[in-house]
Amino acid sequence: MASSKDPGEDMKTNLTRTAYNIIIYEALDFTVGLFTAEGETVSIGLGLPMFIRGMAATLKAKLEHFGVEGIEPGDILVTNDAYITGSHLNHITLSLPIFHEDDLVGFACCMAHWLEIGGALGGI
């Protein structure tokens, strides 16, 4: 696959080509992006534009709550907090820290609709 000049668009292309979730690869019910270590937006691969604000707000809320001191390579921060995202529980945000040597330099993030997140009772 040829790379574009926009890393956000490359992330979008890779997700749609590899997703098992039909909502992601057919309806494009997601957004991906790159953020600084402080949570500022660097690049967005447009999927569903309504997620842009929610994804940035969610990353900043995670950083405020947990801090960055304990984040290590291989960690993934996951949340579906509907209050922060301004959405609903099926919208999951994944934030993967990016390191250069030992320094946290940013995050790769994805906010997407998951068809099934489980519940106390079937069908609810």
Question: PLM features: what roles do these ranges have?
Answer:
Residues 1-56:
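Long, charge-dense accessory insertions within large macromolecular proteins
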Residues 6, 10, 29, 75, ...:
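Acidic-enriched, low-complexity/disordered segments with a strong bias for Aspartate over Glutamate
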Residues 48, 81-85, 111-116:
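Acidic, glycine-rich active-site loops and adjacent beta-strand->loop/helix elements
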Residues 50-53, 93, 109:
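FAD-binding core of FAD-dependent oxidoreductases
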Residues 13-14, 18-21, 40-42, 56-97:
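Conserved mixed alpha/beta core segments that line enzyme active sites in large multi-domain catalysts
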Residues 47-50, 90, 123-124:
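Short alpha-helix boundary/capping segments
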Residues 101-124:
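Mobile "lid/hinge" segments at catalytic clefts and subdomain interfaces of large enzymes
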